[in-house]
Amino acid sequence: MSTYSIPYYNQMNGNYNNGMPQQTTAANQQAFPQQQQPTTTGNASQQQQQAAATAAAVQQPYNYMFYQQQGQPGQQTGQTAGQQQQQQQQQQQYDYNTYNRYQYPAATSQGNYYQQTIPNQLSQPQPQHYNGSNRNYTSAPSGAPIPSNSTSGPSQQPPLPGQQAVPIPPHVSTMQQPTPVQDTLNASSTSTVGQFQPPGIRPRVTTTMWEDEKTLCYQVDANNVSVVRRADNNMINGTKLLNVAQMTRGRRDGILKSEKVRHVVKIGSMHLKGVWIPFERALAMAQREQIVDMLYPLFVRDIKRVIQTGVTPNAAAATAAAAATATSASAPPPPPPPVAAATTTAATAISKSSSGNGNSISATSGGSNVSGASGAGSTTSPVNTKAATAAGIPQGNYYQTYNQQQYPQQYGQYNAPGKNQNTPASQPGSTTNDQYLQQQQQQQQQMYGYQSNYYQGGAANSSYYPNYYQQQQPNYASSYPYQQQQQKQQQQQPNQQQQSDQQQTSTPSGGAGTRSVHQSPQVQSLTQGSVHPSPQQHQANQSASTVAKEEK
């Protein structure tokens, strides 16, 4: 035992309030225990009560040691065993009930704490990154520190607002909504999209059936590596994912071995073998390696919607809403039935025009841009057939934009009901159509931001038919008064078209290309001529004769 008396001991601890006259007797007894006789039981209990009252009033920081030093001289001076038990009971009651500065939880609460945290980690091997409320990928586990507040009985702090003070079963209190290990994609926790459409990239997904696992798979190719995502639990082949990042084998295997949730596949086709990891971890790795955009739309959460419509879900909703507002504000778009009719009769009309009219381009000219542009409804350009078939369906949002930007003014001139080419009323219709197209382009630039680079030539620059817009429209206007004379000339000279055919074949390829750019709209007029026969055929014949005159 130390030789310091109790008031000095308190002063050493920074507590100057205990120098009371009642305390000095206890101090004398403890400082000089040999000189005093054994005290009575009432005196000892008085001392203990006084010391407990003063300590509770002051709350000195080291009261546990203070009580032990007070208890030891009493034991040395011959107190009875009952007094020692009373002292120990008071020590226990005091330590855990009135001492609220450090808040040691009771033994039962510590047991509950470990019961709640440890089995949770055992029963749920899924790392805490994929858990409900954690968006960032490197956060601490969310469930661990909660039970100390919810179950420790003597602690003075109020429990958290979402929890009760009653002890709760472990699996309920730590995780309010435990996610199953099988489904590694939490649509409610993180962002609803997962990945937006990067500029300049169109979605390319292959859907395959994995027979062994009996699930669908979504396969995206990048850097000559096919990365696969399962449809049932959204796990992704991490081996192939890191191969896209061109990572070395050692680093790749080290990263995948450290994953807590992984599924190793050793049997099957090449793109299915490897270590499969959860969706969130794969997304984190892809973001770290900066390969997310290359793998679009693998990380779009609602990837089925992308496959059906061809656009990211919230982007599709935004484009549909913007298109609805634009159509209500400006002139109505061209009606879909003539477009569908043009697609059905496109091949026959082009074959007829290639045999009858020498100025048109044959449909067999393959994949060149000029022939693709010659028939807006021709079956050679896949984008237009999809757009024409999906014209009345809301899923056609993705492809309609390509149509209206590639062939804007032809649709305005030839498809507008009640407007012929040779009437001057086509010009105000084309201006309203220009406004509509500008709005469409602005929306496209807002949504995607890249199509202006690819399709600049719609209405603004007209790079597809530059000479047509500058020269051919004045030809229509100037040739209109002489229509009857030109018809007579055509009747007198039926062989002009054959001569123009021979001239075109004799001219070099560059000249033929420029003429084909001039004459490509006439093919369209002929395809539309299958719907509205009489005026467009006259117009095609007139324009053919004028071009033949120019060549002479």
UniProtKB/Swiss-Prot annotation:
Where would you say this protein principally sits, based on its record? nucleus
Biological process, per Gene Ontology: positive regulation of transcription by RNA polymerase II
- The residue ranges flagged as biased composition, category Polar residues, are 121-151, 419-434, 516-546
Cite the InterPro entries for this sequence. Answer: EFG1/Phd1/StuA, HTH_APSES_sf, KilA/APSES_HTH, Tscrpt_reg_HTH_APSES-type
Where is the protein situated, by its record's location annotation? Nucleus
The protein's UniProt keywords, in alphabetical order, are:
DNA-binding, Nucleus, Transcription, Transcription regulation
Q: Which residues form the HTH APSES-type domain?
A: 204-310
UniProt biased composition (Low complexity) = 340-381, 435-447, 478-504
Protein task? Putative transcription factor that stimulates pseudohyphal morphogenesis.
In Swiss-Prot or TrEMBL terms, this protein is called Enhanced filamentous growth protein
Naturally occurring in which organism (per UniProt): Candida albicans
Q: Which gene encodes it?
A: EFG1
